[in-house]
Amino acid sequence: MDVINMTGKAALHYAAMLSSAVAVLVVARVAVAQDSAKNSAPNYAALVAAPDRTEADRQTDQRRDPLQLLVFAAPRPGMKVLDMGAGGGYSTELMARTVAPTGVVYGQNPDGLGERAKARFEARLKTPAGQNIVSLVRPFDDPVPPEVRELDLITFLFFYHDTTYMPVDRAAMNRKLYAALKPGGALVIADHSAKAGDGTAVGKTLHRIEDEALRREIEIAGFKLVGQGDFWRHPEDTRDFSIQPPPNKPVDEFVLKFQK
């Protein structure tokens, strides 16, 4: 069609059609780019080795081996992540580094977090690595506001056992986590292993939980177990001593990945 020979009204209509087509194409390309970023694994080793990480976090690395966790959980740039029981924000910041620059990490803590942990978490928010971290001070059984939806990943690291002796409705909590994830989204939970048969009974005394008991609670909410990590396993652990304060001997820890 020759735009020069159009009437003014027709030309304007044609120009509007072209503009709409270009806008659709741009949006489509952005969406493809975002999906491609989410499907591309970042260099986790380089992120862990980043020179601006604190010495305190590097000390924690010695017993946590975060590279293994990142590979297992598989956070990607652009993802929306919820870190449950974020504490001082050690794992929250690691996740934030992996989803940057366009992703976001919500760090949930209940009201009444200890002052030291609270100070460490708030300090992270002021650093370049913490610019995509959003603090959520909310109860475990209502961990996210209504507008936080379609999450790609939820992490719940070494804190689930604490909810067994706190005034927390764990069934409600797990349903909320399920609702907050997008279809296909993942929930990764790590905790200290209790003996078979101990269930949730030693959460307060030994700070442990039986993996099968935890699994049952999560699956009741609708989740499906899709992976297990053995990189923190220590079969020599007798599982009859408290991990608080941290003992000077190996502790068996399980890591489970569930999917919505």
Predicted regions and their residues:
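A short acidic, Gly/Pro-enriched loop at the edge of an enzyme's catalytic core
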Residues: V144-I154
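Conserved class I S-adenosyl-L-methionine
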Residues: G78-G87
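Class I SAM-dependent methyltransferase Rossmann-like catalytic core
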Residues: Y44-L70
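A short glycine-rich, Lys/Arg-flanked "PGG" loop and its adjoining helix->strand segment in the class I
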Residues: A96, R170-P183
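Conserved beta-strand signature within the Rossmann-like core of class I S-adenosyl-L-methionine
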Residues: G184-H192
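Core SAM-dependent methyltransferase catalytic element
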Residues: D237-K260
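S-adenosyl-L-methionine
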Residues: A117-P145
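A conserved beta-strand element that flanks and buttresses the S-adenosyl-L-methionine
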Residues: T155-F159
